[in-house]
Amino acid sequence: GSSLQKALAICQDTRYPYYCFAQLLKQADMISGETIAGLAGRTIAFIPTNETLKNALAGKEIPGADKLMVYEDGTLGLIDSGNGLTSDEKIELKKYISNYFLVASSVPSACYPGSKMENGEYVNYSGNTIVYKDLGTSLSIQLKDGTKVVQVSGKYNYFPFCYNDGCFHFIESLLM
């Protein structure tokens, strides 16, 4: 079967709506071959769209990623090619990006409106708590100590993209 980790790890094509997220994983040194460092077992990911990440990078809203941008052709890279991320910036970016992955051992199934996944609090890979809400016709997530409720994109009728090692949803804003 196909793997969520592999799909993200090998993504080089800007046409994929998760391309920018995959490139942030690479910039944070989280990719090892076809796997994502630190992810084990089943995972549920909430992935900001390329457009969301492009705007967030331009606004310097992503911790550890101030030196990154999305170019006109849609590729993600350094603002100044001679000035890569420091190890501290990579650690900061990794800690932030890890917020978007839920530990699936704490999650009963793929989530969609009406699924078996209960409203409640779930731990993410940064060790922070995500508040998950099934609103009946839509889904939302929020960092427990965060200020922003993030809506899951309805573009695909709130159904997740499923893989043998997990699933993901798109979101159209950042966790703050």
Predicted segments with their positions:
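Mature, structured domains of secreted/extracytosolic soluble proteins
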Residues: 1-176
